[in-house]
A protein has these predicted regions:
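Conserved N-lobe beta3->alphaC-helix segment of eukaryotic protein kinase catalytic domains
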Residues: 3-29
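Protein kinase catalytic-loop region centered on the HRD/HxD motif
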Residues: 81-93
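Activation segment signature within eukaryotic-like protein kinase domains
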Residues: 77-78
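Conserved short submotifs of the Hanks-type protein kinase catalytic core
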Residues: 44-58, 62
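Activation-segment/catalytic-loop signature of the eukaryotic protein kinase fold
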Residues: 40
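Conserved end of the kinase activation segment
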Residues: 156-157, 175-186
């Protein structure tokens, strides 16, 4: 159960909106490798998010305790991760904080993607095209094409986003080196690549 004290949110409308967005996203998804939302409870002092229990703990701790994963186990877990992330992207959702600590294991050692605090939504039917994606680092191009314009509904075109978030060790370069627009799906794919490297025994989690 995830408990959020209302006094920790205060009167910050952005923080409160993020919490309700996370809950709304969890209500929309159903996949064997994504955490299930059982219930949301609100009181005057707290907001409670009751989630599926994953008895296997964090994948990060599992790798530390076992030092490495065998090829078949790593392949199976990564396939489950890709399946879950692919499902999210088809639903118009990006996670933006994929990391070993946000991947839990159930009692059968299956991946459970959790922590949607940085997740956001986009229009999966609005494809940007290669020219736009290749020129996102150019402020003149972005301004000329009005890509930084927020459309009705609070989104930009396609999966364009600007908020820098996530965890540095897993973050895509465009999140680290600039404050320009980025494509949310590619940020998730980069994080999946970092996770794959962590699962492969020859590298090890500490790299």
């Amino acid at each position: 159960m995830k408990l959020i004290r209302r006094d920790s949110v205060g009167t910050n409308p952005t923080r409160l909106a993020k919490i309700y967005r996370e809950i709304a996203i969890l209500r929309e998804i159903s996949h064997p490798n994504i955490v299930r939302l059982h219930e949301m409870v609100e009181t005057e002092k707290q907001i409670g998010i009751i989630l599926e229990y994953a008895s296997g703990g964090e994948l990060f701790d599992y790798i530390l305790n076992h030092r490495y994963l065998k090829d078949n186990a790593a392949r199976r877990l990564f396939a489950q991760l890709v399946s879950g992330v692919g499902y999210l992207h088809k639903k118009g959702i990006v996670h933006r904080d994929l990391k070993l600590e946000n991947l839990l294991l159930d009692r059968n050692r299956n991946i459970i993607i959790t922590d949607f605090g940085f997740a956001n939504t986009f229009n999966p039917d609005d494809e940007l095209g290669d020219e736009i994606e290749y020129n996102l680092s150019s402020r003149d191009f972005v301004k000329r094409m009005e890509l930084d314009k927020v459309l009705p509904g609070g989104h930009r075109r396609g999966d364009l986003m600007q908020t820098s978030c996530g965890s540095p060790c897993y973050a895509a370069p465009e999140l680290v080196v600039s404050d320009s627009l980025y494509t949310g799906r590619k940020v998730d794919v980069w994080s999946c690549g970092v996770i794959l490297v962590s699962l492969i025994p020859v590298f090890g989690v500490l790299n």
